[in-house]
Amino acid sequence: MKDVIYITGHKNPDSDSICAALAYAEFKNKTQDTPAIPVRLGNVSQETQYILDYFGVEAPQFLETVKLKVEDLEMDKIAPLAPEVSLKMAWNIMRDKNLKSIPVADGNNHLLGMLSTSNITATYMDIWDSNILAKSATSLDNILDTLSAEAQNINEERKVFPGKVVVAAMQAESLKEFISEGDIAIAGDRAEIQAELIELKVSLLIVTGGHTPSKEIIELAKKNNITVITTPHDSFTASRLIVQSLPVDYVMTKDNLVAVSTDDLVEDVKVTMSETRYSNYPVIDENNKVVGSIARFHLISTHKKKVIQVDHNERGQSVHGLEDAEVLEIIDHHRVADIQTGNPIYFRNEPLGSTSTIVAKRFFENGIRPSREAAGLLCGAIISDTLLFKSPTCTPQDVKMCRKLAEIAGIVPETFAKEMFKAGTSLKGKSIEEIFNADFKPFTIEGVKVGVAQVNTMDIEGFMPLKGEMLDYMNQKAESMGLEMIMLLLTDIINEGSQILVAGRSPEIAEEAFKVKLEDSTTFLPGVLSRKKQVVPPLTQIITTRVSK
């Protein structure tokens, strides 16, 4: 498995989550050898896209899970066999590479079958079928290679040999009893036998013992269009070896193949292997092309993926499969929740307005100047998370760091913020689902599940005609997720307050937390701009009180 570190923000990523991951990846790549890859767990918001576009930075790649996939394994990178390859060549390859089976693929590398040692041995151990070369359409090239033979005369019109294999170990006058037209005859150096076989119109004459037929025999073969080859092996050895010239597609397993995909989870492949008994399994990619094979030992010698979490520490907000990964670091500015790691980690949690402030501090504490792009991303994220220093979560450190980064990025925070918020708060063309889920976070407080979404907008009134439809969606989401209460904050940065919409089984939780009375499931909360500092704490207090009663 490639040794990399994934740096990820939370699900439904906001600007701080995306920008902190990108910038921290730059920091890690400047301070360590192991490559750090920034990733995201959801779509990029309009606001975040504005920041990325302004500084010419690509969005991080999407990461579905950190559970191990087949593509993460050190699989055997073995070129599949072509279907026409001889058993002899296949056996040599498998012996040299210590393989018990090998994939067979067509010219486009699409899987045709699997050739195993048991397929090959069965060909030898089964009752001899003298017509096997005809049935398998064995080529002359395979026969020449297998017998280390040389061609003395070739019938170019005949691609395969239709008859049975016969060792001509009898008198010339007895040949008619055993030889039919089109047969493959193995003979020694007796000219009268060779001539009689040609007259009987065999399709292939194999002369053994390293003997070269006379000119008269060759001329007779040319006249009758008979292919003649010579081999250094004796007749017994030639008859024993010739079966090795069969093409692998004749003996390979074609039906009920069990292949795995590079995108399959290792845990699912383990189940597949427990239910089957193959020694190796072909691996195919998204284009159905063979890329290698794996065996059971590949699943045993696996390593966990390495992850650094930024802007979150709750498992429910993190990447799928986190429990199967190795968390190396957590950089966050939220409450400490249900983190649990197998080893000691670098855990940095500070009560600041933005995780990006902490990431920026990491640069300067280590004497590293962030690039213009990284500085711009961090600056934009701080502006976003602190609502241009208006959020109660904002600290003097956030303001100082933002202005320091702005100098490197070559922007004026106030001017940049105006355009950024304008781009980010537009709800035009968005569906109810897109609006709500753009920045939605679930929380579990004393066993009670709640969810809070937040949308920054400069036009709360323009949204209100959608209120009924939004509340219906919120109730559906609360029921499907088992949430006791669900809330949407429509935050007006300019007027410094939030209109809240509340749904779920227990909307009174919000009323008690904010000491308000909901009218038609909504009310305005003056001065409330921060979900983290002004919404989650009062919700936590009320729920804790209710549970303890």
From Swiss-Prot:
It holds the Pfam family DHHA2. Binds tightly a transition metal ion; prefers Co(2+) over Mn(2+). Signal peptide: none annotated. AMP binds at K100, S116, T117, S118, N119, T253, V258, Y278, S279, N280. It catalyses: diphosphate + H2O = 2 phosphate + H(+). Coiled coil: none annotated. One of its GO terms (molecular function) is inorganic diphosphate phosphatase activity. PROSITE patterns: CBS. Residues 74-130, 252-310 form the CBS domain. Inhibited by AMP and ADP with 25% and 35% of activity remaining, respectively, at saturating conditions. Activated 5-fold by diadenosine polyphosphates(Ap[n]A) with n>2 (Ap3A, Ap4A, Ap5A, Ap6A) at saturating conditions. Belongs to the PPase family. NCBIfam families: PRK05427.1 (NF003877), PRK14869.1-3 (NF011441), PRK14869.1-4 (NF011442), PRK14869.1-5 (NF011443). Homodimer. This is Cobalt-dependent inorganic pyrophosphatase. It comes from Clostridium perfringens (strain 13 / Type A). The lineage of its organism: Bacteria, Bacillati, Bacillota, Clostridia, Eubacteriales.
